[in-house]
Regions:
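Core alpha/beta nucleotide-donor-binding catalytic domains of modification enzymes
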Residues: 3-129, 136-149
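Aromatic-acidic/polar surface patches that form glycan- and anion
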Residues: 22, 136-140, 168, 172, ...
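A broad, structural surface signal
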Residues: 52, 145, 149, 204, ...
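Class I S-adenosyl-L-methionine
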Residues: 73-84, 95-269
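Short hydrophobic-aromatic micro-motifs
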Residues: 90, 178-181, 280-284
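Proline-centered helix-kink/hinge sites
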Residues: 92-93, 127, 171, 315, ...
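C-terminal target-recognition/interaction regions appended to catalytic cores
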Residues: 224-361
């Protein structure tokens, strides 16, 4: 379904809940909330490059500001004086707790306190509903306990759990921590929203795109562009099989890190996706062949930004760059890899609308 159609459906849907999206990025969470029928009135993010995709696709106000500088009265102004229930949504940057940062000390990073800034804004604005999405390891961090304590003190009914993307139609193995909090009653997070055994795959998501060689671009879609590979990485890709590892290669193709005793820790590096399975978690480095299992299942290249966006669950015509702006893989990597998959926003949005229709206490 085209994104223009989703926007039309959103305009026809119930506007009983109005959302402000903190740390909105390019709009993944907002996209899912809109798909569920929630009206998104604004997004806030410190990255100015996210303004165009957010405003273009979500058709809501983008506020270029650090969440640290935002106040509850600012949020009141964004929500306005309507009769809608207020939802404050967001995904604070997760780098301190990410499984990609092996051995990182969360106390050595400043980003962890953004969750407490989120909690401050909840206390200052007292929205009817709150939702947060983040990495699963955050669940055991002291800062998360502090955040929960603040919500409970304010009188919120709270639910949170680790959610698997494949249980909600995402063609990706991503697991995330999802939280709901409500002043209107308990909002349970569903375990799954697709039938048991129904799994979306890489083939389902990207098989219909035109084939490309490494370094080529689809003339009809600038985001369907494959990063060039070095000669040795092209040889490595040719020697790889879907679902395999670098152990399938001849010795001369193996990197120095693979020859060390610790090399067994990097089984998925230089890996190739399988057609009939979900993709691995899409990270900001999906365009780098050596950074994970990001090889295309049969074409001798890494996945493109468009393919990464589809594996994240974005609509096929979601736009990330203004017309004529050159593709920068690092910028798009952050936009797409850091995005909340819309499927997670949609499952929370539907749960909140169900709670509005049938409140429980």
């Amino acid at each position: 379904m085209g994104w223009a159609v989703w926007n039309m459906l959103g305009a026809m849907a119930s506007e009983s809940v109005a959302a402000v999206d903190l740390f909105c990025g390019a709009g993944g969470l907002s996209c899912g909330l809109q798909q569920a029928g929630i009206k998104v009135v604004a997004g806030v993010d410190v990255d100015p490059s996210c303004r165009w995709p957010f405003e273009r696709n979500i058709e809501a106000r983008f506020v270029h500001e650090s969440v640290r500088e935002v106040t509850g009265s600012d949020l009141d102004g964004l929500w306005g004086n309507g009769d809608s229930h207020r939802l404050l949504a967001g995904c604070a940057p997760c780098q301190p707790f990410s499984s990609q940062r092996r051995g990182a000390d969360s106390k050595s990073h400043e980003a962890w306190d953004l969750l407490l800034e989120f909690g401050r804004l909840v206390a200052e604005s007292r929205p009817d509903f709150v939702t947060m999405e983040n990495v699963v390891p955050l669940k055991s961090a002291p800062v998360f306990g502090q955040f929960l304590g603040g919500l409970a003190h304010l009188g919120y009914f709270i639910d949170f759990k680790a959610v698997r993307g494949v249980d909600h139609g995402l063609p990706q193995t991503r697991r995330r921590l999802v939280l709901t909090a409500s002043l209107k009653g308990f909002v349970p997070i569903p375990d799954r929203t697709v039938p048991e055994g129904q799994v979306s795959t890489v083939r389902d998501a990207i098989a219909g795109l035109p084939p490309l060689a490494a370094g080529q671009t689809d003339p009809d879609d600038p985001l369907h562009c494959a990063r060039a590979l070095t000669p040795i990485n092209l040889r490595r890709r040719v020697a790889s099989r879907p679902g395999g590892t670098w152990r399938d290669w001849p010795e001369e193709l193996r990197a120095a890190c693979h020859r060390r005793a610790t090399g067994s820790s990097f089984q998925s590096f230089y890996g190739v996706m399988e057609w009939d399975a979900p993709s691995p978690t899409i990270t900001t480095q999906y365009h780098n062949y050596g950074s994970g299992r990001f090889g295309h299942p049969e074409q001798m290249r890494t996945i493109t930004p468009r393919e990464a966006a589809l594996l994240q669950g974005f609509p096929p015509d979601y736009q990330f760059l203004p017309p004529g702006v050159p593709v920068r893989f690092t910028t798009l990597g952050k936009m797409i890899g850091n995005a909340v998959p819309p499927a997670f926003g949609a499952l929370v949005g539907r749960a909140i609308l169900d709670a509005v229709a049938c409140p429980t206490h």
